[in-house]
Design a protein with these regions (language model features):
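Membrane-embedded hairpin module used as a gating/binding unit in multi-pass transport
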Residues: 356-452
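Gly/Ser/Thr-rich loops at beta-strand to alpha-helix junctions
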Residues: 367-369, 482-492, 513-516
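A general structural motif
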Residues: 430, 454-468
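Proline-aspartate-enriched helix->loop->beta-strand connector
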Residues: 475-476, 480
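Short Gly/Thr/Asp-enriched flexible loops that form oxyanion-binding sites at enzyme active sites
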Residues: 489-501
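Extended, charge-rich low-complexity interaction segments
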Residues: 534-567
């Protein structure tokens, strides 16, 4: 792809290579040259040899003496009028500061009354400060200004008072402990045992025309080595108290148990794309990830079979999630009726605004391509169905929410992308970047913006422009852009970063990249990037949650954004994925903060599955 004059200037000392076939006799312009950003890969693959290649600054304005094909390096033998190379400008040495002297008297300011009754004061030293004060406000037509020592003048302006932190929202999670799950004649909670009504399966099947079969299992820790179809979602079991709405008031949540949805279509095809996590549960779950189960938890696992060939259509996964929520909602209704004796802990979350600190926003890109790629936003109940809107139906445009709405289950994730980088519903309930930013006293988190990733490129750029304007209106000092998955959604992921960056706002991007998810698009604003990869080989290994955003990425991203907002240098990444970059950055942050960063395990800590053995390891 050809470059612009601006790019040519920025890459003046990089190799000059034709982007397209060029006829003899033309004068070389930026439009004739290829973007140097792609050269490393071409050289590595043997498609490009840069030996003897001139630089961009040398060839601009020169005459091509021979017709050349695309990707032809420009050398002396095909050009006439090559310019002499220049040395890259070196940084100027800092000027030595003059010795501090006693503060001299400030020069006498001149004052004059002008037509219209305005007093003009001009101070010639410093930055040519001009003050205009209505004479009437002074009660005089102008007086000589007394000479004031400069040191005194410098302190004349009173310091602006520092505004105090302000709590703009509180959310209380009320924890109910569950140690056992059984089937019984009715859904109820007795002590620490949850009973699920026998026969509820028939209602799940009857609720949705596309649901053809449903099987409910209770998986206890001693049954983790049980075969399962691909895991579509992991969900907390939570409900609002009284009239409280999402993100406010009190939310009751069951500890020790999660909902797990799995499924196929009638033909046995997994409901997933670019990988699936079917197999033994203990071999295919990355325990403790924000979106995954924790070891020791009980799974209420529902396996749904949808109509054949609807697994890749929008209606198939939607029907599966909607039907499965019948069970969760019945549990929610029981939770609402429990008295406070069942509450074992109250956890208070606060949304705090910090005036005077750097204001930041988190932009989270979620899937919105249609088919199986969709999400429900802002249901009535945490991670519920009722009242929610699909982001595809909303046009994938930005939706602004509070941090507490995120942590209260405002996203019901329908997405069936590759398991390793999929952010499940529970991920948002425990969203690590939101939690890190909320608790960091050095930044002012103003909110979270969810934006869908459309399928069509024109729609992607339309949505990205909305993101840019939304963030600009917030008047923030910095932004994060995160995404799950990789591939098609990286087009708008890069565009979001560009739209924010071009408005002068430093922005840090977070995504699974590494080897398999390496970005195929980019722009000059993508200079601050954090890779979510944790897999040994840098790939989508089909282990649930392996390469999702964790606390360690939240810490690294915050450190990088702070550096960017302060104007500090952030070194460019190496041209190939190198896991040592992450470890080096972690060590630097630990040294600066004096605090150990706990890194999570990867798939090597799990028993080896047959799939991993055959396909990956």
């Amino acid at each position: 792809m050809s470059i612009t004059a601006e790019t040519a200037k920025a890459h003046a000392h990089d190799p000059a290579v034709l982007c397209c076939r060029a006829e003899a006799g033309i004068t070389i312009e930026p439009a004739n040259l290829e973007d140097p950003a792609i050269f490393d890969d071409l050289v590595d693959s043997g498609l490009l040899n840069l030996d003897g290649c001139l630089t961009i600054e040398e060839v601009l304005g020169a005459k091509l003496t021979k017709t050349c094909d695309s990707l032809c390096p420009l050398t002396d033998d095909v050009l006439d009028g090559v310019k002499a190379p220049t040395t890259p400008a070196e940084e100027k040495a800092e000027e030595e500061a003059p010795a501090e002297e006693a503060a001299p008297a400030a020069p006498v300011a001149t004052a004059a009354t002008v037509a219209g009754g305005t007093l003009k004061i001009h101070i010639g030293e410093g930055k040519d400060i001009n003050l205009e004060i209505p004479v009437g406000a002074l009660g005089t037509t102008g007086e000589a200004v007394a000479e004031v020592p400069a040191a005194v003048a410098a302190t004349a302006t009173a310091e602006a008072p520092v505004e105090e932190e302000k709590v703009v929202g509180t959310l209380t999670r009320r924890h109910i402990k569950i140690t056992d799950v059984q089937r019984g004649p009715e859904t109820k909670i007795e002590g620490t045992t949850l009973y699920i009504r026998e026969g509820i399966e028939a209602e799940v099947i009857a609720d949705q025309e596309l649901v053809k079969d449903f099987h409910l299992e209770i998986i206890t820790p001693d049954q983790y080595h049980t075969y399962s179809e691909t895991i579509m979602d992991v969900q907390p079991i939570a409900t609002k108290e009284g009239d409280a709405i999402l993100g406010e008031g009190a939310t009751r949540v069951l500890d020790g148990v999660v909902m797990m949805l799995t499924g196929t279509d009638e033909g046995g095809v997994q409901i997933g794309e670019f990988g699936s996590s079917e197999g033994y549960l203990d071999e295919n779950i990355m325990w403790g990830r924000p979106g995954c189960p924790d070891k020791g938890e009980i799974f209420i696992k529902g396996n749904i079979v949808v109509q054949e060939k609807t697994n890749m259509e929008r209606r198939g996964p939607m029907a599966a999630h909607t039907a499965f929520d019948i069970i969760t909602q019945e549990i929610r209704e029981v939770m609402k009726e429990l008295d406070d004796s069942f509450i074992v802990e109250d956890e208070e979350l606060k949304s705090i605004r910090r005036p005077g600190k750097k204001k930041v926003v988190i932009v989270k890109e979620i899937m919105g391509q249609g088919a199986m790629h969709d999400n429900f936003i802002l249901p009535v109940e945490p991670v519920g169905i009722l009242g929610a809107r699909a982001n595809v139906d909303l046009g994938n445009v930005p939706v602004c929410v509070s941090p507490l709405e995120v942590l209260d289950g405002c996203i019901h994730a329908l997405t069936c992308i590759g398991p390793a980088s999929k952010e499940m519903s529970r991920h948002y309930w425990r969203e690590p970047l939101v939690l890190e930013a909320l608790h960091d006293e050095e930044v002012d988190l103003c909110g979270v913006v969810f934006v869908g990733s459309p399928q069509i490129n024109a729609e992607k750029y339309y949505v990205s422009r909305r993101v840019g304007h939304t963030v600009e209106m917030m008047d923030v000092d910095g932004a994060f852009v995160t995404t799950e998955g990789f591939g098609n959604n990286h087009i708008d992921f890069a565009s979001h970063i560009e739209q924010i960056g071009m408005r002068g706002i430093p922005v840090v991007g977070l995504s699974f990249c590494a080897v398999q998810g390496a970005l195929v698009v980019g722009n000059k604003y993508m200079q601050y990037m954090v890779d979510n990869n944790k897999s040994e080989s840098g790939i989508e290994n089909e282990v649930l949650g392996c390469n999702t955003l964790c606390q360690e990425e939240g810490i690294r991203a915050l450190a990088m954004l702070k550096a960017a907002m302060a104007g500090e240098e952030v070194k460019a990444a190496e041209k190939k994925w190198n896991p040592n970059v992450k470890s080096t950055n972690v060590e630097l942050i630990e040294a600066a903060c004096g605090k150990k960063i706990e890194l999570v395990d990867n798939e090597q800590s799990l028993p080896m599955s047959q799939k991993r053995k055959e396909k990956y390891d």
